[in-house]
Amino acid sequence: MLRKTKFVETPLGRVYISEKVLEHTDDNPNNEPSWRRKNVKYGLLNLEKPQEIWQGYNGNYVFVNLFDTFMLDKNKQPKRVTLFVVSVTSKRGRWITFYCEKNDIAKMEKYRHGKLIYKDGNLP
């Protein structure tokens, strides 16, 4: 589990900042420049309000829709998830990389155009 070191208040709640850093390479299919960033701090954010704009701990603005904070379970019922927001990877905010903790297994996911695309992965 991430060690919570401090937090930042946002309109959607507290963002807990971890001292851990992340190095991540993102292959972009839309011919946008590849993204590689070191020493990216990430935090814990529990999304509760739809269509809010909040300023993240790294100064980026992110558009959030309430529906995207849920995943469907085996019975196709929505299940609330808690997101570990990592970074916004483009100025337009089209790509948001984050981690989702579910049943002690961390999944790396991408948020793009209002859809969640799931990929296997682990917290660094």
Model-derived regions: residue spans:
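Ribonuclease/tRNase effector modules and their secretory precursors
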Residues: 1-124
